[in-house]
Amino acid sequence: MNHCLIMNIEERSHTRSLGPYRIAHWLRENGWDAEVIDYCAHWSHDELMELCLSRINDNTRFIGFSSLFTGWTNHMEIFSLFLKNYYPNIIQISGSSSLPNADMSAVDYHIYGFGEKALDVLLKYLFSNGEAPRATEYFNTQLIDASHYPAYPLNEYTVLYEERDYLQPWEFLSIETGRGCKFKCSFCNFSVLGVKGDYSTSQDSFEKQLNENYDRWGIKNYVIAEETFNDRTEKVEKFSQVVQRLNFEPWFAAYIRADLLISRKHEVEHLANMNVFGQFYGVESFNQKTSKAIKKGMDRGKMKEGLLKVKEYFEKNNNKYRGNISLIVGAPYETKESLYSSLDWLVDNWKTQSFTAYPLGIPIYGRQSILSGSYSNNEYEEISAEELYQRHDKRYVDKVLKKNNIMKDNKILEKKWLMWKNKQMDVVEAFKIHDHMYDVMRKEKFKKSTFAVAEFSGKESTIDDKLKLDVNAVKTFRDEELQWVEEYKKKKLS
């Protein structure tokens, strides 16, 4: 039987990403022996080498590296070079929702996007005399854009875990209910947009995963991996029916479109019946002109009123709600004054819950957004690094350059995101406003965000404990996570 290892290389110690487990499950369905190795950023080189010596055999065909945003560190680069030197005949394949890093010098192939079908073509080419995949050279690796081999819609997105994954009852897992989003917001560069029809997974698959994970591992808590979970009311009802049949009480977090939640009469009840108590609202802006420009045009007064009613409903009926309002700093026509006004409203009305804010990114490489091709129509223009250094202190400009470009030896190898300016602000000012908002968040002790609640893991902490966390109170839980990582490594190496 063909064998492979799939390394989860996310730097966050607390995260078991869904991607490597989905690929491993798919490989097993196709006759492979695939083992996932988690928390690789927290393994020493000696530990990683010991693991390889205990696992790699004559049937090992490839080593996979999986991350959501290509979290390739120097630590992983050294390990990858060791593999290439020690096992030169074993292929290295990375996969991510982002393009490969410039310094992945020993990785043979990088799959960009939902990767099951692209990986199928690649493996048949490598090991079964199949046709060569469409690939282009990108820095040091062969890049395969998975959109050429669409893995959506699929009949199901099941992930079944194994004993050697060492799942723990206090963990949060991700569960995929569908792929793609029916909407096309102007700032969004997700790979599957404008989906027509309901291609969500079946009730049977959803129920099977929930029951197996509870019966075998005692797991009850989940993040729903779908771009907009409440895009269709009938879909929410479908999964709600499953949850009401379970013999345990799960807790779900999901991306929820707030305007739909507010405008639909019974949507709140359906989400409550399904125990979707962690809700991430991509509001993006409370400025009316801005919201219209990004295609989220509900009246902002109605939006605020509706969000407060939703919060009141959940806070009154249970103590497991976490509503997170997310804003974009620098969205079209957003002013500094409107952002600070939004911040004041959050302080006055939302401190029992959470908010997040992100500087606007306009992608100019890889998958692009509507705004990528029309930013000049929305009063944006490119600003040079030289002008940014003239306007701002070096520390902030260095930070923005690193975030917006692929850098090596302090030089820009390739632009990732537009360095922009408009009449209201420039990209560095957006980062400064973002940082100020987070200073206020910490000062006012907002609660930990929806997905941060799901990320913080530790065997001594319950969901109730995590929901009490404000943004400042993390150390105890971080210590628990790192203790678990050490236990996990010992189990894998024993």
How would you describe each model-predicted region?
Residues 153-319, 329:
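Radical SAM [4Fe-4S] cluster-binding motif and immediate context
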Residues 1-209, 216-218:
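Acidic, low-complexity intrinsically disordered segments
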Residues 4, 92, 222, 252, ...:
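Hydrophobic/aromatic residues located in beta-strands of well-ordered beta-sheets
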Residues 1-9, 28-29, 33, 45-50, ...:
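Radical SAM enzyme core and accessory elements
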Residues 84-94, 249-252, 320-323:
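Short beta-strand/loop segments at the ligand-binding rim of alpha/beta enzyme cores
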Residues 103-121, 270-278, 343-359:
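Structural recognition of alpha->loop->beta junctions
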